[in-house]
Structures are given as C-alpha cells and as structure tokens.
C-alpha cells in the first residue's frame, strides 16, 4: 500500500521552507500569472528554480499551478509559461482549463499533468475524461464524501489516474470551480485568480413576498467553516487517496508550518505499521495547534455528508483561533485571565466583548498569586470586562523562524590522495525527490 502524499501550500519562499521543514512530501505554488491566487506573493521562474533546487535536494516535489480559465488570446503565453516551469524543475502542473490541458498534452507531452479541483471532477466520467487528456492525477471536487472518493479512486486506478483530495482549509460556498459570485458582486472572477471573497461578506435574509427582513443565525450567511479531516486520515487512506492537499497559499508561513506538522505526525501514526493502515487521531495539543493556526470553526463537511448549518460559520468569516479562557477581572488597564493554557509574550489574543472583538499582542506578562495571567490592555481592548471570552489567534511558540539551510541534508564525503595526482573530493547524498543517489566529484 502506498502512503498518502502530504501536499502543502506555499505563497512565498518562506512558506515553502516551512512546508518542507514540517514534513510535506510535495508543495504546490503559483507563478505571477495564470494561477488562482494572484494575491499571494507567488514565484518568478528564477525563484521557482530556487524552490525546486531546495525542495528536490530534500526529497520534496514541486507542483506549479496554472489553475485558471485561459482566454483564447492567452494560450500561447500559457504554453510558454508551462514550458518554462517544467524546465525550471517542476514535477507536475496543476491545470483547470480543459483546453489548456489538452494543448499541453499535445505540444508538451513529457509534462506531468494534474487536474485542478477547479475543474470540478465529481464523477467517473470526469475521471475518464482526465485520463483521455493525459492527466496522471485528478484533484477531486470538495463536495464529495469519503465513500464517493473511494469509488472514484477505484475508477481512477482502472484508468491509470491518481486521485487527490482536499483535507484542510477554506471551503467555498459554491461548487468547486463553478462560482460566479465574485464576478457578479465584486467584478473579480475567481476563475481568473481574483476571488473577492463575496461569500465572507455580511448579508441579510429577506422574505421575498413580504419584502421584510427575517431573523438569521448571524450576519455571514454564506460563510462556511474550515475543512479539517485530521480525524479521517485512516478512512481517506483506505479510500485510496494518493495525495492529501492543504489549502492556504494566501496564508502565512506560521500557518503552513503548524498545519503541515500536525498532519505529518498523524499520518505517520496512520502508517506506523508498514503495509497497513492504523486508526489515528490527533492529540488535544495537536488539535489546538490547528485551531490557533487558523480556524473559522472546523467541519468535516461533505467528507461525512454534512450539508446543513453544521458546516457554516454564520457569526464570523475570519480566524477565531482557539479558546483559552475568560477574563477574571479588568481594572486600571490590566486584564487578569483565567487561562486554561499557558500564555507567552508575542501571543495574539482576541477578546470577545459585548461590543465586538478586540485583538492585541501580548507585550508584557505577569501572574497573580492564584497563577492567573495578567496583561496590560492597549487602546483597542479598553472595553474588556470580566467574563469576556479570550481566544488565541496566533501562538508565539508556533511561530516559524525561517532558515533556508534547514532541514540540513546528510552527506557522505571522501578524499582521495595519490602522489603526483590532483586531490579528488567527492560528496554524495541518497535522498532526492526522485529517490536517486546524487554524487558530486571535483579535483
């Protein structure tokens, strides 16, 4: 049985380093054009080459996203972009546009094609169509259950196509790749890399007949929670998923490091016994790490057939973090917090007050005789009162510190000395993304 590949996002070089150090098997990233996250920092061909060299040396693959709808006049430039990405060392290209995928398969047959979730592959016909286009992998639509994924994985195996599934991160309210809300409301097309996040805006619910507002569970009526499949990794492994994808090219290196590290540890427990799949769940600390990295509230959503209010985040459309306790008292600009978990200087806390939410960074920290944390409130948090809930939206201890030399690669060196001949030095290392021995010699 082949282990699930852990596929991590990278919107910049720091996030790439974080993904590799946290244990990703592969990283997906975008160039400056033709990708669905044009708001990320993204990569140039030059920095893509650097990314490929860094990752391949450490046994990690790089997939480049060309995952938007391409206009007729852009096909030539898109093909050239694909060609340059492949020459730079990309291991695969992730494509949304059917026409572009067909053209790449025709003009550049050596390139490995992966079908984006934006192509909305949700049935056997879609899998077989991808195989006819020459694709080697399909990222399935996110609206599928584990049972449906298992069926499509079997269809894919018969057609010679792997299946990839999203396992963690933001969900869309519309079908994968079929959303026109951003275009209609914000004048920015999600299928052109410019999603305006219209589903995260506040809305009112009205009775169309009587033209009056109705009561609603919150303002953000179209905002889903975040997908979290960390409790289902054994099920996804048995279903035949080849790659588990983490969303987040617009998110920070801290997020990438935290989320990838948790999924890496749990997946390793799933495959603890070689050749079999073991039940594995996250620890409470691991679950908290995911919440603090970014959370609108978590759901398994369609993976377990959930389609109702349970998958929605009506109250807020952004990061809520992890609950850590309540304010015991607040006076003279000092908040005393009965915290259930240890706080640290540099943490970002959010107080849920009767008048809204107030966030601040912990710049000083002391403790009273009862061991309760005491922090000085800044101007934004002056409305904090006793009883208010406190959430941590960024953990200083989980912050990622970039170092492009990490993780270091173990090498073996040998020196050869012979009288009358030049000194010869050789270095070799066994781990590359292709699993081959690499050796360098010089005199």
Task: Give the label of every model feature segment.
Residues 1-21, 26-36, 51-52, 58-68, ...:
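Surface-exposed amphipathic alpha-helical tracts and adjacent flexible/coil segments at the periphery
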Residues 40-49:
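Aromatic- and glycine-enriched glycan-recognition loops and surfaces
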Residues 99-100:
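Alpha-helix capping/helix-boundary segments
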Residues 103:
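Basic, amphipathic alpha-helical recognition segments used for DNA target recognition
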